[in-house]
């Protein structure tokens, strides 16, 4: 009963960041699609967290992290804005898609949490996520 080695082919993954110039200062938005391979996605998340530490705040970090609820916030130390299942899109049972924030004011944080939504769309096996951020 030797353990079997399972080689998994994964596709290239990316992270994109944009810092928007608003009337009240910068707003940074980061999105990523992490690996579905357990452990590797956590390593990717830790690497991204180090990279975004130097980006301007406030900051939103969202996307398909392929990690269950609670894990991304624990790994990054960022504040979760959404805690709802997003997968599979036809009957969501687990949260793999996340919206995290850092540097929001208490008023922005409250408004963002109340506006965070999950959308079931016929284009993916995951639900889409969205949030509105009020600018002071």
Language-model region placement:
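Structured beta-strand-rich core segments of catalytic domains in phosphoester-bond hydrolases
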Residues: 1-26, 113, 117-120
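Surface-exposed cleft-lining segments at the edges of enzyme active sites
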Residues: 2-8, 30-39
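Solvent-exposed loop/turn segments connecting transmembrane beta-strands
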Residues: 8-12, 37-41, 92, 121-123
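Active-site beta-strand termini and strand-to-loop segments that position acidic
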Residues: 17-24, 102-103, 124, 130-136
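A shared catalytic/ligand-binding motif for oxyanion handling
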Residues: 20, 27-31, 54, 60, ...
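Histidine-centered divalent metal-coordination motifs
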Residues: 33, 64, 126
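Metal-dependent phosphoesterases centered on the DNase I-like endonuclease/exonuclease/phosphatase
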Residues: 37-108
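Low-complexity, intrinsically disordered Gly/Pro/Thr-rich segments
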Residues: 82, 107-120, 128
């Amino acid at each position: 009963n030797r353990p079997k080695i399972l080689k998994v082919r994964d596709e290239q993954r990316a992270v994109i960041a944009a810092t928007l110039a608003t009337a009240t200062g910068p707003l940074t938005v980061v999105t990523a699609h992490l690996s579905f391979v357990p452990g590797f996605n956590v390593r990717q998340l830790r690497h991204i967290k180090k990279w975004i530490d130097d980006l301007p705040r406030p900051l939103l970090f969202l996307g398909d992290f392929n990690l269950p609820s609670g894990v991304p916030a624990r790994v990054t130390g960022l504040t979760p804005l959404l805690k709802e299942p997003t997968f599979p899109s036809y009957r969501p049972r687990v949260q793999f898609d996340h919206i995290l924030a850092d540097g929001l004011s208490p008023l922005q944080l409250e408004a963002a949490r109340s506006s965070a939504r999950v959308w079931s769309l016929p284009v993916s096996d995951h639900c889409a996520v969205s949030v509105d951020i009020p600018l002071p």
